[in-house]
């Protein structure tokens, strides 16, 4: 069976005909991963203005080493999130308490009865590590160290913790433990 021009898969859009080019694939951007510093600066700018002008966005983009268009899209997404939160808070009828991000269970938060051994060959560590609730503000020597004011607005706003943020939290935790159990 012979097909005349205008019949068959090429005519139905199944492939390019003679002298035609294949349709170009639409380019899709990879998801942008922001650093903790970038998120902090973007959040500070959002607190100052939900609708920054192009000059402010360009200045901020240069400061955080991002293209202006990424900053613009971040603000669009952040405003959408803000409106969504406002809707949820107004829908509940009461003023909602500020949301804290969910923090995964920390491996170093053990009940006070279990001694902490940093390495098996070093023997037992300090007398005991306080339980997580005590660590967050009421333990001896840790008064207020990890209270609600200890975290930056980026953490308070429900952003997921990035690797750098987790490293910073771990470093702060070690420093707090050093203050609680000073070396001899």
Swiss-Prot record:
SUPFAM superfamilies given in the database record: Homeodomain-like
Coiled coil: none
GO molecular function per UniProt: DNA-binding transcription activator activity, RNA polymerase II-specific; DNA-binding transcription factor activity, RNA polymerase II-specific; RNA polymerase II cis-regulatory region sequence-specific DNA binding
One GO location term (cellular component): nucleus
Major location (coarse): nucleus
The organism's place on the tree of life at top rank: Eukaryota
Tissue expression: Expressed in retina. Stronger expression in cells of the outer nuclear layers than in cells of the inner nuclear layers. Also weakly detected in brain, testis and spleen.
DNA-binding region: 27-86
Record localization: Nucleus
InterPro entries: HD, Homeobox_CS, Homeodomain-like_sf, RAX/RAX2
Keyword Nuclease belongs to the record: no
Protein's GO biological process: regulation of transcription by RNA polymerase II; visual perception
Region (Disordered): 1-32
Function: May be involved in modulating the expression of photoreceptor specific genes. Binds to the Ret-1 and Bat-1 element within the rhodopsin promoter.
Subunit structure: Interacts with CRX.
Protein name: Retina and anterior neural fold homeobox protein 2
UniProt source species: Bos taurus (Bovine)
Gene: RAX2
């Amino acid at each position: 069976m012979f097909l005349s021009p205008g019949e068959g898969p090429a005519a139905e859009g199944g492939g390019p005909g003679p002298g035609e080019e294949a349709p170009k694939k639409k380019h899709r951007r990879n998801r942008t991963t922001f650093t903790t510093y970038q998120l902090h600066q973007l959040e500070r700018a959002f607190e100052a203005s939900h609708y920054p002008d192009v000059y402010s966005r360009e200045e901020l983009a240069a400061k955080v080493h991002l293209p202006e268009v990424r900053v613009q899209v971040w603000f669009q997404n952040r405003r959408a999130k803000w409106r969504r939160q406002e809707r949820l808070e107004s829908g509940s009828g009461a003023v909602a308490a500020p949301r804290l991000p969910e923090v995964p269970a920390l491996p170093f938060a053990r009940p006070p009865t279990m001694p902490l051994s940093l390495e098996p060959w070093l023997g037992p560590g300090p007398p005991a590590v306080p339980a997580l609730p005590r660590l967050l503000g009421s333990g001896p020597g840790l008064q207020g160290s990890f209270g609600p004011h200890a975290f930056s607005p980026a953490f308070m706003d429900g952003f997921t913790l990035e690797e750098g943020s987790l490293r910073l939290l771990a470093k702060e935790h070690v420093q707090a433990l050093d203050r609680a159990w000073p070396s001899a």
